[in-house]
Amino acid sequence: VVLPAYFTDNMVLQQNTKVTFHGKAALGKTLKVTTGWNNEVYVAPVNKDGYWTLSVPTPAAGGPYTLTFTDGKKLQLKNVMVGEVWFCSGQSNMEMPVAGWGKVMNYEQEIAEANYPSIRLFQVKKNTSVTPLSDVEATMGGWQECSSATIPEFSSLAYFYARSLWKELNVPVGVIDCTWGLSLIHI
């Protein structure tokens, strides 16, 4: 089973909705997903090119959970949370990292105190393409728990927004940092 880079350990899935998983699996097999929040098994056929798609209902906020994907060989995603997920995109004003550019007030203290395991971070690696891409690369190897080690190069605006949401809602929060100063969203 092969999943896109944004389906990893430590991820956050949006609560109270349907999440669409997709990926590649062995030809001639059936893909099964077992969700840790209800131990239900969901099944999807693998098409002639090896691709599959499957929508799975998510519960109210909670976790951590394990998701198990199998086509005969098992892949597990661990420490998965369910809560709020936000996509943060923009140019330099959104890109400015917590430790960067000397403009975040008290950034050393903010980094030292950034211990929020219920806030999860996904940072998209910068890339250009003239055609749509089916996947992205993650700068930190996938979803990470918010900590002093993971926050310095992350978007300060995305981080402070996630922290504010987490304090207000008291649910896991996932933020996706897809920023690039002086860039266009399309050509």
Where are these predicted regions, by residue range?
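Extended, solvent-exposed functional surface patches
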Residues: 86-154, 159, 167-172, 178-180
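Residues in well-ordered beta-strands of folded domains
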Residues: 4, 68, 81, 120-122, ...
